[in-house]
């Protein structure tokens, strides 16, 4: 469990994982920096909120929660000594995005897997579309 229910603070175990993972992740991406438009830290929640909460309210409460969690991750990784030389690139290319419950994980029966839906992931967005346009325009 990365976060306590309804909370945005990183737990100690997740901090250890991020401290190990993120500097290596940046190193792996480094040779491809010119092809990367953005790296997104994506926050997701289950669709559940407190009993009696409307679906609309639950969606927006979960939006705030998912955004807060991604911000917590970004703040933590930004402060890591191991990525200090990359801070300028991080400032320009890493975004924290909350998706609320809009991208749930489904089980084998097509039902929401509430535990697996609560997650933070990293997604690389390339600038391939820009490169393709440049190639086509140069012909």
Residue map of PLM features:
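Extracytoplasmic beta-rich ectodomain segments of secreted or membrane-anchored proteins
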Residues: 1, 11-36
């Amino acid at each position: 469990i990365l976060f306590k229910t309804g909370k945005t603070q990183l737990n100690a175990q997740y901090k250890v994982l991020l401290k190990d993972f993120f500097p290596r992740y940046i190193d792996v991406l480094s040779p491809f920096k010119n092809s990367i438009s953005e790296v997104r830290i994506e926050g997701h929640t289950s669709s559940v909120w407190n009993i009696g909460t409307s679906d609309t309210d639950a969606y927006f409460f979960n939006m705030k929660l998912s955004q807060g969690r991604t911000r917590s991750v970004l703040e933590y990784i930004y402060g890591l000594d191991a990525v200090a030389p990359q801070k300028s690139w991080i400032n320009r290319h890493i975004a924290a995005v909350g998706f609320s419950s809009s991208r749930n994980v489904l089980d084998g029966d097509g039902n929401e897997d509430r535990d697996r839906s609560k997650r933070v992931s990293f997604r690389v967005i390339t600038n391939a579309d820009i490169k393709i346009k440049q190639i086509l325009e140069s012909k």
